[in-house]
Design a protein with these regions (language model features):
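Alpha-solenoid helical repeat architecture
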Residues: 191, 204, 223, 262-263, ...
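Amphipathic alpha-helical "lid/sensor" segments that cap RecA-like P-loop NTPase cores
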Residues: 134-168, 202, 209, 218-221, ...
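Extended alpha-helical scaffolding segments used for macromolecular assembly and cargo binding
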Residues: 26-28, 243-323, 666, 671-679, ...
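Short capping/hinge segments at domain boundaries that bridge a core fold to an adjacent linker or tail
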Residues: 161-162, 187-194, 199, 204-252, ...
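Sensor-1/coupling segment of RecA-like P-loop NTPase cores
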Residues: 79-117
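Winged-helix-like regulatory helical subdomains adjacent to P-loop NTPase cores
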Residues: 158-190, 198-201
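Amphipathic alpha-helical segments of tetratricopeptide repeats
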Residues: 215, 306, 334-338, 366-374, ...
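Helix-turn-helix DNA-binding segment
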Residues: 660, 730-816
């Protein structure tokens, strides 16, 4: 008994145990379930149990007067005739008789329903259905026992094994039932009248077919779309392509005549190859109504084209570009560049140019718009203005935007025009003036359904970062990330969010953003450059030389294939500073010359020039080259009257040079560092304060500078716990009482930080600068670590630390 129970679904085991007492306590059991859910297995176990208990098992109702030592076990009761079902129902009323019946749950079969009601008077039915299954098997098995068994018993791949088993089982069904399943696997919205109209049968006959289809358990609403598709494909393979097409064509025609066709049904029919003018029109309307959902919009437009729609290629290219399928979008757009329709040709240029910018080829985008020439469509002229400005052609950008709009002033057109006008204002107007216009583009961004070179959120955030307005930058890009943009810009928004956090010293959060942006599919060139540059910046700030080199070379590879534009100056600046650290500036010199020429061609706008010149100051300092620092310092000084950021950077640059000359004025450093933090450069601000602490011989000033660095870091973590939070070591070198180490670890959190940096070979002075503590305090920590570990020498201590920390480092690498 125990062995047989292991094959039985849990829901039926209790009933089988009760059957052992059937000779003295008759039992009535009803088992329902779809195809391959285990009904026959349960009945086999029931027969064995009843026979062991001494009863004679019959497969059909016995004649009247049969001795009570018999039991009825009926399989596939739904196949019995109405007369047989009536007779069986009458025998169920005999309290002396044990009856076990299994059937599909056909609720519209009157005679079967009478039997089930009679059996359920004694106990509720036992319903067999899908079993819990691993996620990777849900789409091919839906948890159905017969498919799970096939997958486990066959040497084929799970999907193939399940497909073969499904086809084998479906071949047992008659053609009308297969036709009904074929239609109902398309959508759950079809009912009896729909099947009747499509198959040309009576409603009564259709009701029976629908009942059988649902009773099969193959089209449950809980099944995944992928499994329903596999059911449909299996039936199509059985009935053949011609019959499949005939049934779906009949369904489409009947649906068009009696009711609106749902988007899901229209999609499936078009994707199965049906061509019909009315179907194409329906899909086109649905696509136009789902512009906010770019992936579904692209699928609908593609299906409409397959169904025979004309003139939708531009809309499809737009939708594909917004989904991030730039290759397909560019291919469609290129095919339309020779279109005789000027409007279609202009839209194709806009799509192709936008994709080119996303792929890091702004030069090609400018060539496309130059070839097109002036065009009155607002979306086209605005996109062209953005491209020409990014490429350094300010005169053409302004001329392009002067064209009178030919189309209606829609919200999308207004958004694009505000974005282009705001961008031009950043070239020669005060930042507040430009941001007021750019802000209007953000307010209507959701109305955009046509692709442009960059998202409004990204361009506004870039302008805010370049202007030293971290509050605005955080707000705009934070909302964009939370709202979830089209796939084309999702990674860009994450990278910009990470960039802001990196500049503010929130390195763990910045790392999380760049990791999220880099996960999954291959990055397009613009995103690849930003991701590699951001990782380079993070590595430089954490002092990870190996990672710095790795990411810098990756960024240089992306940059080598990149057509430099105005919107890539931030990553270029970080690569410049890293190159100076690595003594590799020569490799970047040509690109730097291009960047400076680009800025000159735009009239050296203060907003876009400041960040690159600040990078030049840093690069010159790292290269120990005062003559390299001077021109960038002078450029910043020249822009002080036009830019708050230039004022902060100019003052900070002079202060930094004095600090390096060991001329540390605490008030001056404090003012410069706080100004840097105010413009979003908290990471640079803390480094300036830390550098000042190292360069002064006055312990009091050194302590004040370290405290300043801590204050700046804590003030910009925005809820993220800082690595050194809670530590208050005085600059005098007296170590604080150590915190209790975590359970299982001999080191406190601070000692672990010191140990990790010690293993990197960093001297006490650099460790102190990193952790904003004095070198003397680092020395005390090292002594305490050695004492805690019981190491007899420094080399023994380092060996023990490597043994302790190496496994954790390995785990971290594996996670990455």
């Amino acid at each position: 008994m125990t062995d047989s129970l292991t094959e039985v679904p849990p829901a039926a085991r209790r009933a089988l145990l009760e059957l052992a007492n059937a000779p003295t306590v008759p039992v009535k059991v009803l088992i329902t379930g779809g195809i391959g859910t285990g009904k026959t297995t349960v009945l086999a176990a029931a027969r064995d149990t009843l026979r062991r208990s001494g009863l004679t098992v019959l497969a059909c109702p016995p004649p009247d007067g049969e001795p009570p030592e018999t039991a009825l076990v009926i399989d596939d009761a739904q196949l019995l005739t109405d007369t047989e079902l009536l007779r069986l129902t009458e025998r169920v009323a005999d309290s002396r008789l044990t009856v076990v019946a299994a059937a599909e749950a056909r609720e519209h079969h009157r005679a079967l329903r009478a039997l089930t009601m009679a059996l359920e008077r004694d106990r509720p039915r036992i319903s067999l259905g899908p079993l819990p299954v691993a996620e990777h098997l849900r789409d091919c098995t839906a948890g159905l026992p017969f498919l799970i068994h096939a997958v486990s018993a066959r040497a084929q791949a799970p999907a193939q094994a399940a497909k073969v088993a499904l086809i084998e089982r479906l071949r047992r069904l008659d053609e009308p039932t297969l036709d009904t399943l074929l239609m109902m696997s398309l959508t759950h919205e079809l009912g009896v009248s729909d099947v009747a109209a499509a198959l040309g049968i009576s409603v009564t006959d259709a009701r029976g077919l629908v009942d059988r289809a649902h009773a099969s358990g193959l089209i449950e609403s809980s099944h995944t779309a992928a499994f329903l598709q596999s059911v449909h494909d299996a039936i199509a393979q059985i009935v053949g392509n011609a019959h499949h097409h005939e049934v779906e064509t009949s369904l489409l025609r009947s649906q068009l005549d009696i009711s609106p066709v749902s988007a899901e049904l229209a999609l499936r029919l078009a994707e199965h190859g049906l061509r019909d003018e009315r179907l194409a029109d329906i899909l086109t309307r649905y696509a136009a109504d789902t512009r906010d959902a770019s992936v579904r919009c692209a699928r609908l437009y593609r299906a409409a084209v397959h169904a025979g729609a004309k003139g939708l290629t531009v809309r499809l290219a737009d939708a594909l570009a917004r989904t991030g399928d730039c290759t397909a979008a560019a291919t469609l757009a290129d095919d339309l560049l020779s279109s005789p329709d000027a409007t279609e040709r202009a839209a194709a240029v806009r799509v192709a140019a936008s994709v080119a910018v996303h792929d890091g080829n702004t030069g090609h985008a400018a060539e496309l718009f130059g070839w097109l020439g002036p065009h009155p469509d607002t979306m086209v002229s605005s996109a062209a203005t953005i491209v020409f400005a990014a490429n350094g052609d300010l005169a053409t950008a302004r001329a392009t935007l002067r064209l009178k709009d030919a189309g209606p002033p829609t919200m999308a057109a207004r958004c694009a025009r505000n974005l282009a006008e705001g961008l031009l204002l950043t070239m020669d107007q005060p930042y507040p003036v430009a941001m007021a216009k750019l802000g209007q583009a953000i307010a209507t961004e959701q109305s955009l359904s046509q692709v442009i070179p960059d998202s409004p959120a990204a361009l506004v955030t870039l302008a805010a970062i370049h202007a030293g307005d971290p509050v605005r930058a955080r707000s705009v890009i934070g909302r964009a990330v939370r709202a979830g943009a089209d796939p084309l810009f999702q990674r860009r928004h994450l990278l910009l969010s990470g960039w802001i956090k990196m500049q503010e010293g929130q390195l763990p959060s910045a790392s999380a953003d760049v990791a999220a942006a880099s996960a999954g599919t291959h990055l397009h060139r613009r995103d690849a450059l930003w991701a590699a540059a951001l990782q380079t910046a993070i590595s430089r700030r954490t002092g990870d030389i190996g990672a710095l080199q790795q990411h810098w070379y990756a960024a240089m590879e992306a940059l080598a294939e990149y057509s430099l534009d105005l919107f890539a100056l931030l990553p270029l600046g970080e690569l410049w500073v890293a190159a100076a650290r690595m003594r590799q500036v020569d490799q970047l010199q040509h690109t730097l010359d291009q960047a400076l020429t680009l800025l000159d061609s735009l009239g050296t706008p203060a907003l876009w020039s400041n960040s690159l010149h600040w990078a030049g100051v840093h690069a010159g300092i790292l290269a120990n080259s005062p003559e390299s620092v001077a021109p960038h310092g002078q450029a910043l000084g020249a822009m002080v009257a036009h830019s708050t950021l230039a004022q902060a950077l100019s003052d900070a640059g002079r202060t930094w040079l004095r600090v390096l000359a060991e001329n540390v004025d605490a008030d001056e450093v404090t003012a410069a560092a706080r100004s840097l933090s105010h413009v979003g450069l908290t990471s640079d601000a803390t480094r300036l304060a830390g550098q000042a602490a190292l360069q002064t011989s006055d312990a009091r000033v050194s302590g004040a500078m370290l405290q300043l660095a801590r204050d700046l870091k804590l003030g910009n973590d925005f809820g993220e716990p800082p690595s050194g939070a809670g530590d208050t070591e005085p600059a005098s070198g007296t170590p604080p009482a150590p915190r209790q180490p975590p359970a299982g670890s001999p080191l406190s959190d601070r000692e672990r930080e010191v140990a990790e940096l010690l293993l990197l070979g960093m001297p006490y002075r650099d460790i102190g600068a990193r952790l904003f503590i004095s070198a003397k305090t680092v020395e005390h920590h090292v002594a305490r670590i050695r004492q805690r570990l019981g190491a007899g020498s420094r080399s023994e201590m380092l060996s023990m630390l490597r043994a302790m920390l190496a496994p954790e480092s390995l785990t971290a690498d594996e996670r990455r």
